[in-house]
Amino acid sequence: MGRKFQNKKKKAAPQLEIVPLDENPPLPPQRSSDDVVPKKARKEKWVNKQRVLVFSARGISHRDRHLMKDIKTLMPHHRPESKMERSKTLSVVNEMCEMKHCNKAMLFEGRRKRDLYMWISNTSGSTGPSAKFLIENIHTMAELKMTGNCLRGSRPLLSFDSKFDELPHLKLLKELFVQTYSVPNHHPKSQPFVDHVFTFTYLDKRIWFRNFQILSEDGGLSEVGPRYVMNPVKIFDGSFTGKTIWENPDYVSPSKQRQVLKKAAKDKYVNRVEQKVKHEATRPIRAYDGMDNDELFEDDDPVETAKILAAIAKKKKEEAAKQTPKSALTKKIKEKQLQAVKDVIERKKARTIKRVKKV
């Protein structure tokens, strides 16, 4: 039995024809956004390896922390980091990014548990630039409860206002936003399709950020959140350091605004006290001043009242006679003006006669 099995020859495997694959197959004329992406497209190379370090310094409020959490959910290419101590300077952020292999940084810095500042910087080689913003009108996703919804990790479209192509400092900020907020293509943590859009609108010398879900291919949108306003403060040449390239001339710090409001409230109290003192000083002793015809009501005799009225009428008539009427005054003024014109004409005639005699 063993010999029989040993003598059996192995069958030769059938040879398969090698057909060259077309690397760039023709695409259909129309594709729907709901179509499933084939697996081959998912295995393409991840070239743009942008990584953003998103973290905060100690001293931010709960709402600021929730905003930072929302931004992290919208940016799958972010890297987390624990809170930075207050004793450390901003130049340490470049070293932290180098340790985490990040080339962009987004730092949230709180002041007095009220004000929130955001830094966006290009930390690759500490070349910069970096921009500082004051964050205003913060509304998180949980607070808004909008009807829009987008898949976690999907790539967004970035929409910019037309003014971002006109002003030079906005051109720089646009490029910084594009490199920070946009999710790299074929990122391992990203979904291979686009279903929401980030809008950056320049209005009232501030940048308004909104996040919308793309409902349909014809442009239907529904807001998702979060929403906040970035008031640009300064743009620096380096990463968290360097010369100031641009500074906002219209920027007023929140502490200065609160100081002005407190001063206005204090002035309101001082004005009220001054008005009270002035009212007490100028308050009349008598309830009313005397009338012109008080004498009429002192006596009930009608004869005496008639005499008083006749005396008052006579007195008014005498005063009116003393005053010159307006018509007489205007007549005198016209006569004086005519006399002055005649004098001027006579002088000019005399001058012309003298000149003729000399000639």
From Swiss-Prot:
Stretches for region Disordered: 1-42
Protein's UniProt keywords contain Membrane: no
Keywords associated with the record: Nucleus, Ribosome biogenesis
Pfam families, A to Z: Brix
Taxonomy, superkingdom: Eukaryota
GO cellular component: nucleolus
UniProt xrefs under PROSITE patterns: BRIX (PS50833)
GO biological process: ribosomal large subunit assembly; rRNA processing
Any one GO molecular-function label of the UniProt entry: rRNA binding
Residue ranges, compositional bias (Basic residues): 1-12
Role according to the record: Required for biogenesis of the 60S ribosomal subunit.
PANTHER family: RIBOSOME BIOGENESIS PROTEIN BRIX (PTHR13634), RIBOSOME BIOGENESIS PROTEIN BRX1 HOMOLOG (PTHR13634:SF0)
Name this polypeptide is given: Ribosome biogenesis protein BRX1 homolog
